[in-house]
A protein has these predicted regions:
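Catalytic cores of Mg2+-dependent Asp-rich isoprenoid enzymes
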Residues: 1-91, 97, 101-209
Length: 209
């Protein structure tokens, strides 16, 4: 896939469509490569040491998508781009805080070790080690506090978006942030079920925007 992106041509229908989209909206090849390279690195078990490593990962899997969307939306002001990066980081942090157990089952720990009160490992989390799970949950709360800072920064850039898409992006961001808020209120049930924001809560949040 990487070679085909660099060539700008592919026999695969999906990749070919993506390359057409890239040409139509003048999406930089570097963004596609950053995205693909991060997915390649993520094929293998991993654990992140610190927040900087997490931000780099989040950039690769999420911020790159936001930057590509800027091109699709016709956002040309370079001042908007850092806000798109921040929103991608924030949303990925929300995902990570929600999916610790699911990720551990896939031999991945994305909550940085620097945010964990005590060390954790995938086996301990999956097997229900109480000390490790308590540590991971506290790490998730610390991560969500950082995510909120990124959401706040991203919100400063909504004005760069065309009116036709601005509200949709604001809704998506708010609903993702609400995942973290639900995680923070779900200590007793966090490990029993995946955190989900109810339809009623989503509707309320949307009406508040």
């Amino acid at each position: 896939i990487r070679q085909e992106i660099c060539r700008g041509a592919s026999q695969d229908p999906g990749i070919s469509d993506m390359l057409c989209l890239q040409r139509d909206f003048e999406i930089p090849t570097a963004l596609l490569l950053d995205f693909v390279d991060t997915l390649i690195q993520d094929q293998y078990p991993r654990a992140l040491a610190n927040v900087d490593e997490l931000v780099q990962f989040a950039y690769g899997v999420a911020s790159t998508v936001g930057l590509m969307m800027c091109h699709v939306f016709g956002v040309r002001d370079a001042k908007a781009l850092p806000f798109a990066v921040d929103l991608g980081v924030a949303m990925q942090m929300s995902n990570i805080a929600r999916d610790i157990l699911e990720d551990a089952e896939r031999h991945r720990i994305y909550v940085p070790a620097s945010l964990l009160p005590t060390p954790v490992d995938c086996d301990g989390l999956v097997q229900g080690d109480k000390v490790q799970r308590a540590s991971a949950y506290q790490g998730a709360l610390r991560l969500l506090a950082i995510a909120d800072e990124y959401y706040a920064s991203a919100a400063l850039g909504y004005g760069y978006l065309p009116r036709t898409v601005r509200q949709a992006i604001k809704v998506a961001a708010r609903l993702y942030q609400a995942i973290g808020e639900k995680v923070a209120r779900s200590e007793k049930s966090y490990w029993q079920q995946r955190t989900v924001v109810s339809a009623e809560r989503k509707c309320l949040l949307i009406t508040e925007l």
